[in-house]
Amino acid sequence: MSYSIGIDYGTASGRVFLINTTNGQVVSKFVKPYTHGVIESELNGLKIPHTYALQNSNDYLEIMEEGISYIVRESKIDPVNIVGIGIDFTSSTIIFTDENINPVHNLKQFKNNPHAYVKLWKHHGAYKEAEKLYQTAIENNNKWLGHYGYNVSSEWMIPKIMEVMNRAPEIMEKTAYIMEAGDWIVNKLTNKNVRSNCGLGFKAFWEEETGFHYDLFDKIDPKLSKVIQDKVSAPVVNIGEAVGKLDDKMAQKLGLSKETMVSPFIIDAHASLLGIGSEKDKEMTMVLGTSTCHLMLNEKQHQVPGISGSVKGAIIPELFAYEAGQSAVGDLFEYVAKQAPKSYVDEAANRNMTVFELMNEKIKHQMPGESGLIALDWHNGNRSVLSDSNLTGCIFGLTLQTKHEDIYRAYLEATAFGTKMIMQQYQDWHMEVEKVFACGGIPKKNAVMMDIYANVLNKKLIVMDSEYAPAIGAAILGAVSGGAHNSINDAVDAMKEPILYEINPEAEKVQRYETLFKAYKALHDIHGYKKANIMKDIQSLRVEG
């Protein structure tokens, strides 16, 4: 009997799972919030701009070391039988390190400098740099831009590097290496400085055939090309391959065999496809969490406007992986719950339920459109299909009779409408959607939301029993790297998580949602394209950081 470890680094917490490679059984698990959380308003008591989202890399080592030690001890499994370790990570979450690959935020002189810290995926401080990168690419007719949805996001690696070059050159001067946090964890495990094709391909303008797009970087700033060449470029390891064995010292520290193999890191949402078994084309998978990723696989590379990228072999060898997404989903619902009136909070407490459960109870019998509300879910910008992190959310139809649960439902529906925009974009560009999978912690807990999604999308919705699908997907890659399975497909068939339930759309609800969706799309186009300056002008009055 052999086992594999999956380490899943999310936005707010980390998870370490020990998985049976024969049947996918979870033998042991460890879950812990990051000690320093997400650093968004203050760093060591100093105010930071509202567009920033930072983390402390020491939290990642804490998860890895405490988590692996715990599952080995708790499971009583002989470490010799743990054949592989896989890692998934939020992306683009990047780390700046010294020549010893130690993060520069640990240097005393940079303790209070926000640019020395990990730039989390949802850090939007590089929006000006992203715009410059985009405009330069458009002006020079870079054909490969279509592989990234004809857009550049401030969430990606290169704009974040440009941000540090422009605003904290002293940090860049002390930086020897820049890498995805997932690559950094792989380095700590193996002592090898390599890069995953998944992370580079989706977040750093790197392609298997051509490498980095230095022609574009040179036109922006020759110094940028040199930074990428000297500090980012490294040997690339593809998903499905092995980086190598555990470093001897790390094996001893973690209580594992030094023969344990380590796979390259995979982006967290992408790992979910493996965890639930969505490994074919014509299947769209929604990974619902803090944000939502909408993923598809296809034999061909289509240039789909408004998506976040398409990369060959980033999930399954030889297939192109496509990613689109929404920047605020779980975060948005959490925001609404925190605004609940005290009477709702008290009622939920008295009935021994959460505020979410209370609001779901209040809305579950409402018909679509009953509240008279419709919302734009852009509270953290719009990733797809508008690709504009500076857009903000709106809600329409409020009256003095509007209740808090009506607002909550409007936001549930808004995220479903945003998903429909993405699904239609895929379909308009020759990628048929026959099945829709939903995975992550939210679908398992919120049947009301899943009913809304099935009827808005007008598709059978397959809800997976997969609160921890990324960790399972990471463990699958660990199993392949350790030789427990001959291929990713074989490992997926053996280890994937089961279906929880399926929902079929209802004709009356579908019809009502079609009417609402037309209104959503009209508002989407007005505030996203035609009159986008209205909300941006209001935002410009905020204090600049």
From Swiss-Prot:
Which family does the record claim for this protein? Answer: Belongs to the ribulokinase family.
Which HAMAP family does the UniProt entry name for this protein? Ribulokinase (MF_00520)
Give me the reactions it catalyses: D-ribulose + ATP = D-ribulose 5-phosphate + ADP + H(+); L-ribulose + ATP = L-ribulose 5-phosphate + ADP + H(+)
Look up the EC number in the record and give it: 2.7.1.16
- Gene behind this protein: araB
Please give the PANTHER family that the UniProt record associates with this protein.
FGGY CARBOHYDRATE KINASE DOMAIN-CONTAINING PROTEIN (PTHR43435:SF4), RIBULOKINASE (PTHR43435)
Molecular function GO labels: ATP binding; D-ribulokinase activity; ribulokinase activity
Superkingdom of the source? Bacteria
Q: Which GO terms describe its biological process?
A: L-arabinose catabolic process to xylulose 5-phosphate
Q: Which organism is it from?
A: Staphylococcus aureus (strain bovine RF122 / ET3-1)
Q: Which SUPFAM superfamilies match?
A: Actin-like ATPase domain (SSF53067)
Q: For this UniProt entry, which residues form the secretion signal?
A: none
* Known pathway: Carbohydrate degradation; L-arabinose degradation via L-ribulose; D-xylulose 5-phosphate from L-arabinose (bacterial route): step 2/3
Q: What is the lineage of its organism?
A: Bacteria, Bacillati, Bacillota, Bacilli, Bacillales
Question: Which Gene3D superfamilies does this one have?
Answer: 1.20.58.2240, 3.30.420.40
A GO term from the CC aspect? cytoplasm
**InterPro entries annotated for this entry?**
ATPase_NBD, Carb_kinase_FGGY, FGGY_C, FGGY_N, Ribulokinase
Name of the protein this chain belongs to: Ribulokinase
Q: Which UniProt keywords apply?
A: Arabinose catabolism, ATP-binding, Carbohydrate metabolism, Kinase, Nucleotide-binding, Transferase
